[in-house]
C-alpha cells in the first residue's frame, strides 16, 4: 500500500522546482536600452532586439522623430522613446543621396582623394549638426531623461556611427556596449578600443587591400591609416568639447568610447583576414542570416521556368532608389544575353533593353532567393548584409560597389575567390556579361562560396546567440571590466614603450660614453708611461 506521504514529497519537490524556475526567469529578465543607427544598420540590431524579446527581456529603442526604417508600432513588444528633432526624413534622404553620389563621382583614388575628402568634410559637418540635435533631444530633455532613469535599464547597446549612445549610458549610470561593422582604417577600434593593427599585414578598412601586400601596397596602407587618423582627430574636436560640457569635466569622445564593455563586430573569419584582436571584441557577422523560406507562388513559378539554367538575383540594396536611364539600359542589355532568368530589384523606369528573361520587382525576399537551389549568382552592391546572406547560402557574387564599405567588402570576396568586381562608372554591357559568365561557369567561384559557407556554419555558437549571450553577460555581471586591457590606462608614449626605449637608449649611450672615456683614459695613461720609459 502506498502512503499519502509518498505523494506529498514529490508534490513539494515539484512546487519547489516551479518556484526556482520562476525565480530564474525573473532574475534573467532584464531591461535593455537601444541607441541605433538608421538604414541597413537598423536591420542588424532589430534582429538582436527581437531575440532579446524572445528571451523575456524588455527592450526600449531611442529613435528620432525623423527616421527611415525605425518605425514604432503600437502592437510591437518593443518600447519606443521618440526623440523630437527639427530635421525631416527628407534631410536624411538627401544626405544619403549626396554621400552615394560623392562616392560614385569621386571614388577615392590618388587623383581624386583631395576632392573627395573636401566634399566629405562638408557632409560630415551636416551629419554633425543632425547628430547634435539627436543628442540634445535626449541629454537636454529633462522629462525624457527622468523616464529613462525610472526605466531601470541594465545595459545600453549602441551603434557608434550615431554618436552619443555612450554619453546617455554614462548619464544613466549603466554599462554600455557597441555593435558595429567598422570605422575607416579601424580608427575607432584602434584608438578607442585599443585593438592592435600592425600596418604590415592588417589592411586599413576602406583601403581595398588584402593581408597579402606588396611593398607599394604597404606604403598605401600606411598612408591610409595616417590619413584616416588625421580626419578623425579633426572630426572629433567638436565632439570632445560637447562631451566635456555634458559630463562637466575635461574628456574626449575617444576616452568615453573606450569605456565600452563589449564590441560586437558584424563580421567573422569567413570574411575577415586573420588579425590580432582583444577579448572584449566578439565577431558576430551574419547574425541576421536564416534558412530560406518558401517564396511567393508567382516568384517560385518564374524560377522553376528557368529549368537547369537557374536564376540570377540582382539587388543594389535599400539605399539606392534607381539608376540613370543609360546605366539601367546597359545593365538590362547584359542580363538579356544570359540563359538564366533574372530577378532584379529595381524601382526606376523600365529599361528599353529589358529581356524576356528578366523580371523587375520593387522588393525581393533576398535571403530566401539566395537560399533557393536554382540560384546561380548574386549581383550585389557589396553591402555587408547582402554579402553575408550570399556567404550563408554559398552563392558566388558579381560586385558592383558604389559607396562606403562596399568596395572594401568586394575586395575581401575577390581575395577569397568568391566574387568578380565591375566598376559601375566605367563598365560596359560586355564587362557585366563577362563577369556573370565567369562566376556562373567557372566552378572555382561556386566552390569557394561553398567553402566560406561551411566555415560560417561551422561555429560552436551561432552569431545571433553569441551577440545575445554577451549582452546578457554584461547585464548579469554589471559590465565586463575583466576583459578590458590595461592599454586604456596608458599614455601614448607608455603604450608604445617610448619611455622604456628612451631610458634604455640613455643607459646604452651612457655605457658607451663611459667605455670610450675609460679607453681614452687608459690610452693616455699607458701613453705617458711609455714616453717616460723611453726618456729613461
From Swiss-Prot:
Glycans are attached at residues 58, 322, 356. GO terms for molecular function: glucuronosyltransferase activity. Residues 1-15, 522-536 are cytoplasmic. The chain crosses the membrane at residues 16-36, 501-521. It is found in: Endoplasmic reticulum membrane. It is a multi-pass membrane protein. One of its GO terms (biological process) is bile acid metabolic process. Residues 37-500 are lumenal. Its EC number is 2.4.1.17. It catalyses: glucuronate acceptor + UDP-alpha-D-glucuronate = acceptor beta-D-glucuronoside + UDP + H(+); 17alpha-estradiol + UDP-alpha-D-glucuronate = 17alpha-estradiol 3-O-(beta-D-glucuronate) + UDP + H(+); 17beta-estradiol + UDP-alpha-D-glucuronate = 17beta-estradiol 3-O-(beta-D-glucuronate) + UDP + H(+); chenodeoxycholate + UDP-alpha-D-glucuronate = chenodeoxycholoyl-24-O-(beta-D-glucuronate) + UDP. Its main location: endoplasmic reticulum. Keywords: Endoplasmic reticulum, Glycoprotein, Glycosyltransferase, Lipid metabolism, Membrane, Transferase, Transmembrane, Transmembrane helix. Mainly expressed in the nasal mucosa. GO terms for cellular component: endoplasmic reticulum membrane. CDD domains: GT1_Gtf-like. It is an enzyme of class 2 (transferase). UDP-glucuronosyltransferase (UGT) that catalyzes phase II biotransformation reactions in which lipophilic substrates are conjugated with glucuronic acid to increase the metabolite's water solubility, thereby facilitating excretion into either the urine or bile. Essential for the elimination and detoxification of drugs, xenobiotics and endogenous compounds. Catalyzes the glucuronidation of endogenous estrogen hormone estradiol. Contributes to bile acid (BA) detoxification by catalyzing the glucuronidation of BA substrates, which are natural detergents for dietary lipids absorption. Belongs to the UDP-glycosyltransferase family. UGT2A2 isoform is part of the UGT2A complex locus which displays alternative use of promoters and exons. The locus is defined by 2 alternative promoters resulting in 2 functionally active polypeptides UGT2A1 and UGT2A2. Alternative splicing of exons results in additional isoforms for each protein class. PANTHER family: EG:EG0003.4 PROTEIN-RELATED, UDP-GLUCURONOSYLTRANSFERASE 2A2. This is UDP-glucuronosyltransferase 2A2. It comes from Homo sapiens.
Amino acid at each position: 500500500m502506498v502512503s499519502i506521504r509518498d505523494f506529498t514529497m514529490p508534490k513539494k519537490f515539484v512546487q519547489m522546482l516551479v518556484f526556482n524556475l520562476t525565480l530564474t526567469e525573473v532574475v534573467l529578465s532584464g531591461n535593455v536600452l537601444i541607441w541605433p543607427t538608421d538604414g541597413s544598420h537598423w536591420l542588424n540590431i532589430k534582429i538582436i532586439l527581437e531575440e532579446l524579446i524572445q528571451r523575456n527581456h524588455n527592450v526600449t529603442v531611442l529613435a528620432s522623430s525623423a527616421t527611415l526604417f525605425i518605425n514604432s508600432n503600437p502592437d510591437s513588444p518593443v518600447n519606443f522613446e521618440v526623440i523630437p528633432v527639427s530635421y525631416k526624413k527628407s534631410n536624411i534622404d538627401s544626405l544619403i543621396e549626396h554621400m552615394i553620389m560623392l562616392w560614385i563621382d569621386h571614388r577615392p583614388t590618388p587623383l581624386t582623394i583631395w576632392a573627395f575628402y573636401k566634399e566629405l568634410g562638408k557632409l560630415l559637418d551636416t551629419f554633425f549638426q543632425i547628430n547634435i540635435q539627436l543628442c540634445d533631444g535626449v541629454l537636454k530633455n529633462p522629462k525624457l531623461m527622468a523616464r529613462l532613469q525610472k526605466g531601470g535599464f541594465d545595459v545600453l547597446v549602441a551603434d557608434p556611427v550615431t554618436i552619443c549612445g555612450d554619453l546617455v549610458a554614462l548619464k544613466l549610470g549603466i554599462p554600455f556596449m557597441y555593435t558595429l561593422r567598422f570605422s575607416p582604417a579601424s580608427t575607432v577600434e584602434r584608438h578607442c578600443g585599443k585593438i592592435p593593427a600592425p600596418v604590415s599585414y592588417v589592411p586599413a578598412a576602406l583601403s581595398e587591400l588584402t593581408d597579402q601586400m606588396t611593398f607599394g601596397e604597404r606604403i598605401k596602407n600606411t598612408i591610409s591609416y595616417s590619413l584616416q587618423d588625421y580626419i578623425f582627430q579633426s572630426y572629433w574636436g567638436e565632439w570632445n568639447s560637447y562631451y566635456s560640457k555634458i559630463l562637466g569635466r575635461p574628456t574626449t569622445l575617444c576616452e568615453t568610447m573606450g569605456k565600452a564593455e563589449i564590441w560586437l563586430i558584424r563580421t567573422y573569419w569567413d570574411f575577415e583576414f586573420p588579425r590580432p584582436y582583444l577579448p572584449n571584441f566578439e565577431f558576430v557577422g551574419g547574425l541576421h542570416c536564416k534558412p530560406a523560406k518558401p517564396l511567393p507562388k508567382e516568384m517560385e513559378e518564374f524560377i522553376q521556368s528557368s529549368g537547369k539554367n537557374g536564376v540570377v538575383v540582382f539587388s543594389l540594396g535599400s539605399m539606392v532608389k534607381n539608376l540613370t536611364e543609360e546605366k539601367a539600359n546597359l545593365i538590362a542589355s547584359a542580363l538579356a544575353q544570359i540563359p538564366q532568368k533574372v530577378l532584379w530589384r529595381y524601382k526606376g523606369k523600365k529599361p528599353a533593353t529589358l529581356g524576356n528573361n528578366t523580371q523587375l520587382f520593387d522588393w525581393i525576399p533576398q535571403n530566401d532567393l539566395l537560399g533557393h537551389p536554382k540560384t546561380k549568382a548574386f549581383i550585389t552592391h557589396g553591402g555587408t548584409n547582402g554579402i553575408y546572406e550570399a556567404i550563408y547560402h554559398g552563392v558566388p557574387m558579381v560586385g558592383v560597389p558604389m559607396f562606403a564599405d562596399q568596395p572594401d567588402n568586394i575586395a575581401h570576396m575577390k581575395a577569397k575567390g568568391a566574387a568578380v568586381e565591375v566598376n559601375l562608372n566605367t563598365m560596359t554591357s560586355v564587362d557585366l556579361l563577362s563577369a556573370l559568365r565567369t562566376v556562373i561557369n567557372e566552378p572555382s567561384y561556386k566552390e569557394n562560396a561553398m567553402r566560406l559557407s561551411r566555415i560560417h556554419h561551422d561555429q560552436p555558437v551561432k552569431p545571433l546567440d553569441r551577440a545575445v549571450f554577451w549582452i546578457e553577460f554584461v547585464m548579469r555581471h554589471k559590465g565586463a571590466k575583466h576583459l578590458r586591457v590595461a592599454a586604456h590606462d596608458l599614455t601614448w608614449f607608455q603604450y608604445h614603450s617610448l619611455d622604456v626605449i628612451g631610458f634604455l637608449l640613455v643607459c646604452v649611450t651612457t655605457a658607451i660614453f663611459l667605455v670610450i672615456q675609460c679607453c681614452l683614459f687608459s690610452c693616455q695613461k699607458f701613453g705617458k708611461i711609455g714616453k717616460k720609459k723611453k726618456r729613461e
